[in-house]
């Protein structure tokens, strides 16, 4: 079949992609940085995160296993395994047409993306990748680029890894996001990807989606002169009844770079924001608001490192039932606005503390490992 090959076969027609935005290890926090809200847990030994285990080393969890909310059936349900395409024979795709065909069909698939695929998009026109249930889509090597907006709608058991998605630059037109997860989608794990300069958002989760985990990703902006650098929206309206009791999301070991707001900005869900790095870049645009509350959103903001953020803890609109943001163990450096939470958040129903690191270790760890840095589809650095 054109543009695709099974595992072990040599595929043709795809250009070898260049290395992506692998970042060097960061430095320790500078003198004068402050930590507030309690003590930070130290890195520990092996742990499980539901039936998809999250075993750890001294430098974080096993990076080939899903952790967090993606490993739960629901807010009150038990554990599940996030397997994506499972044991299906990998297919190597070298054209966007083949990637789109396999990603949107009804079979379990493991899809390895080879080369730079897609022709980009603008507004609501161009290449858009529709992903259905039981799919693993992973870049074949570090820096694999996808020039297409990604849409996961009413799909479950999806793994997306090791891809760089670059948008055309943010704008006010409410156009496609780099990644949009919606419509009863659940058990989605997004890992070691990069989302840059999304039009409306970099990676939004809305309209009844649930049990999603983001690990080791970069959500960034590199194009100056754009006014809508609003990265991660959770629910698009206070009037979104299909999201009530859903939109439970974990963000762990991610890096927000030069985002103005929505890091993330939430409604409805139980949101766990832990061990993430936030860095502002005034040359691209001011980072105004960090983790933001909205209608009926319950947030645990834990052991993160905020650098050059206007208001890292944004209590925002704490209206609706159960709206709180508890901030604990965070590190603030060159931040001017609010750094304190309000209320007591939910208790995450999954294991994570044994591989959570202190906020003082987040910068070096995340700068070294976040992004599309995996040398192969099965790499676990």
Briefly describe each language-model feature range.
Residues 67-112:
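Acidic Gly/Asp/Thr-rich repetitive segments characteristic of extracellular carbohydrate-active
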Residues 100-110, 118-138, 144-162, 167-185:
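Extracellular beta-strand-rich solenoid/capping regions of secreted or surface-exposed proteins
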Residues 123-126, 147-149, 172-182, 197-206, ...:
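Extracellular beta-strand/beta-solenoid scaffold signature
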Residues 265-381:
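Extracellular beta-rich repeat passengers
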Residues 134-142, 156-167, 185-199, 209-262, ...:
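Right-handed parallel beta-helix
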Residues 58-70:
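Boundary/junction segments of secreted and surface-exposed precursor proteins
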Residues 1-59:
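Ser/Thr-rich, Pro/Gly/Ala-heavy low-complexity intrinsically disordered linkers and tails
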